[in-house]
Each structure stands twice: as structure tokens, then as C-alpha cells.
Amino acid sequence: MKKPASKIRDEIAKLQEQLRQAETREAERIGRIALKAGLGGIEVEEAELQAAFESLAKRFRGGQGGANGASSGGKKPDGNATAGASAAAVGSGAAQGGNGEA
């Protein structure tokens, strides 16, 4: 049985909202960790911070051998698309959150 286009659009909208919420949770989690590590008080450009996060993500995915051994960090192989978005959100959120909480 075929679904009407309106029902498919509704399902897509629900999935997009779920994705937005999941990305927000991921960004908040990474932001909290970054603040605990002291990144909130450091003046650094967002592009430079994003590059550092991408390097860190490669390390945990096994792209670069780390001293402690690489692990997946619980990330799915397709987590690459949201990793950049999360890192960008953390870059702007860490600077804002760090000034307000410190």
C-alpha cells in the first residue's frame, strides 16, 4: 500500500526534528566536556578549533594512531557528517558558555 505524499512529508518533518534534537544533545555533551577541559576561556578562532576537533575525531576513529590506542569512542562510521556540525556548534557554544559560567 502506498503512502500519500502528505504522510511522507509528516514523517520527514518528524525525523528532521529528531535529528536536530540528537545533534543538539551531541553538541551540548561535547561542549560540556570542552568547558571542563578549559576551552571556554581560550581565545581561538572557530576554524582552528574545528580543525583540532576533526583531528581528535580522527584519532578516536583510528585514523591516526594515538599513544593509548585508538578506539571508536562509540561513534558510528557515518557519524562524520554530524561530527563537523557538532564541532562547529561546540566552537561557538564553548566560547559563549565559558564566559557566562566562569
UniProtKB/Swiss-Prot annotation:
The keyword Membrane does not apply. The keyword Cytoplasm does not apply. Residues 62-72 have a biased composition (Gly residues). Residues 61-102 are annotated as: Disordered. Disulfide bonds: none annotated. To A.tumefaciens Ti plasmid TraC. This is Probable conjugal transfer protein TraC. It comes from Sinorhizobium fredii (strain NBRC 101917 / NGR234).
